[in-house]
């Protein structure tokens, strides 16, 4: 028998930049996509095959507030130690009881702050784009993915797919 999956709904979201919360002004969050580098096999029947490497990851989020802390994050990440970005949400799914927590911790370089256009009577939309160097995504008590570029760790579903690569390199 086929069992229908019920969609999940984000009830509310919050972002923390260098410890400061942005509850109520998080407009959107694009969760980073994890994408394989591929190589093309040519011939009578060509195809693309995974190369065992992951493309660089970027993410973007939008706030409806422009403040000193967002620009401070740009400066600290560029010329000092990277500051943490933490994204939390409450995710509801009908028939599952209580909503579950979503959590994504990210560090990386702020590559762009786009304050957008100013229009009288309109809500602001400030876009912040990050080049992600560390990411840890969980929903409920389940870690979905964690990767750490600097330490060459890629955990997906609890499996570290780069452990053998580190071992091959003597790490």
Predicted regions and their residues:
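Beta-strand secondary-structure signal
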Residues: 58-62, 84-88, 103-105, 127-131
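Mixed-charge, glycine-accented linear interaction segment located at domain edges/termini
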Residues: 109-171
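Eukaryotic N-proximal low-complexity acidic segments or loops
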Residues: 38-44, 82-83, 90, 123, ...
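A short, compositionally biased
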Residues: 6-12, 80-86, 131-132
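Short, acidic/charged, Gly/Pro-enriched secondary-structure junctions
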Residues: 74-104
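A generic structural micro-feature
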Residues: 51-55, 77-81, 98-100, 120-124
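Short, conserved charged micro-motifs
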Residues: 68-73, 139
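Solvent-exposed edge beta-strands and adjacent loop segments
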Residues: 1-68, 107-118, 156-170
């Amino acid at each position: 028998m086929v069992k229908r999956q019920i969609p999940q709904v984000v009830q509310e979201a919050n972002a923390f930049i260098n410890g400061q919360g942005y509850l109520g002004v998080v407009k959107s969050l694009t969760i980073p996509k994890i994408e394989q580098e591929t190589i093309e096999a040519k011939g009578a029947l060509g195809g693309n095959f995974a190369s065992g490497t992951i493309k660089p990851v970027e993410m973007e989020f939008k706030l409806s507030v422009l403040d000193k802390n967002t620009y401070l994050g740009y400066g600290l990440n560029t010329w000092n130690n990277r500051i943490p970005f933490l994204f939390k949400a409450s995710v509801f799914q009908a028939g599952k009881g209580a909503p579950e927590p979503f959590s994504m911790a990210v560090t990386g370089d702020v590559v762009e702050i786009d304050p957008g256009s100013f229009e009288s009577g309109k809500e602001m939309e400030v876009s912040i784009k990050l080049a992600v160097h560390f990411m840890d995504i969980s929903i409920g008590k389940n870690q979905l993915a964690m990767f750490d570029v600097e330490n060459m760790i890629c955990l997906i579903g609890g499996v570290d797919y780069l452990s053998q690569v580190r071992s091959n390199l003597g790490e």
